[in-house]
């Protein structure tokens, strides 16, 4: 089933050649990301299927939405997904490692929004599937490298939006602080009201301000979603 096209309200995604399939984390980030500063240029780091870039193309009027993907199969598939969408003229995917991309682009015009659903399993466990491991494990793109690179590519009033494990939140805040990036909003995500917090959605920028912190609960019970979650993703999912 996971190799079938995933149909959203305004676009469809083929994912049969992508190691990491569409999941809740990516949809959450794409729907949650703040567009209140009306970004003209967006960069999606580690785009995979192209999901988040496509969601932001639907949500925003940004003239330029770049994506970056190191794994060849995922890169090729994201390009096809972009071309098959209504926003192909605004979407472009680079096939490169992040450090190479930063070195090449840091003297160019900066991005108003940089967004990433980064690989975050830092355990030594490997599945045996090289592409899935590369997509999933933090040693493929360490959080430190991601934040440092993003700080070089972000415009003065730009935002860096991430979804990370809640267990990594403190580490992320320490790293961003050392690069003069500060959290202006944090949403902590839990599966149900009684379950522990699993994820942190964080928006950073270069302006220090009081951090708005809230929580998002996804389900009341199995496949019975909360109104707040449905409201967040209602423009994307065909049904909930």
UniProtKB/Swiss-Prot annotation:
The protein's name in its UniProt record: tRNA1(Val) (adenine(37)-N6)-methyltransferase
Annotated family: Belongs to the methyltransferase superfamily. tRNA (adenine-N(6)-)-methyltransferase family.
Record PANTHER family: TRNA1(VAL) (ADENINE(37)-N6)-METHYLTRANSFERASE
Taxonomy of the source species: Bacteria, Pseudomonadati, Bacteroidota, Flavobacteriia, Flavobacteriales
Locations listed in the record: Cytoplasm
Keywords from the named record: Cytoplasm, Methyltransferase, S-adenosyl-L-methionine, Transferase, tRNA processing
HAMAP family reported in the protein's UniProt record: tRNA_methyltr_YfiC
Alphabetical GO biological process terms: methylation; tRNA processing
Domain of life, per lineage: Bacteria
